């Protein structure tokens, strides 16, 4: 999907190619969402017998969505590392990318720690294992007005 996102931003892309690519991106996003929600279902089963502390709190995102964010961050790190070493780029470009790479790696360390802490807090009853479903509508023939109107005609 990462490369699809690069291609779709090409000003010279033909409309028909862009439409095909947009559908591939939507399909890929839906598959990713389904996988993330399946991982969260695993965590729900794993932690369902945890006795919550009286002052247990919720989190803004579930473990699986945090892991999804981590996977995107790792992709950014990979591509930023490529850019920071690209010999056809200017020295200034490589320097800026190297600085961004340092920031991305720090964010990765912080996010890994936060995910570990979240899972530990859930396992010890300090955080409530709660999932916020994405409820994607654009691929659903019953929820997307364009799709359900098309099926009526």
Predicted regions and their residues:
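Anionic, Ser/Thr-rich low-complexity intrinsically disordered regions
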Residues: 1-153
């Amino acid at each position: 999907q990462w490369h699809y996102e690069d291609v779709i931003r090409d000003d010279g892309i033909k409309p028909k190619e862009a439409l095909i690519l947009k559908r591939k991106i939507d399909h890929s996003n839906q598959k990713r969402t389904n996988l993330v929600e399946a991982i969260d279902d695993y965590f729900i089963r794993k932690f369902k017998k945890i006795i919550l502390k009286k002052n247990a709190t919720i989190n803004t995102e579930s473990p699986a969505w945090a892991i999804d964010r981590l996977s995107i961050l790792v992709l950014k790190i990979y591509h930023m590392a490529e850019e920071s070493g690209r010999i056809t780029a200017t020295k200034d470009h490589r320097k800026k990318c190297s600085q961004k790479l340092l920031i991305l790696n720090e964010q990765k360390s912080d996010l890994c720690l936060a995910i570990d802490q979240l899972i530990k807090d859930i396992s010890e009853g300090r955080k409530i294992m709660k999932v916020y479903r994405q409820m994607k509508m654009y691929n659903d023939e019953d929820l997307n007005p364009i799709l359900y109107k098309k099926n009526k005609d």
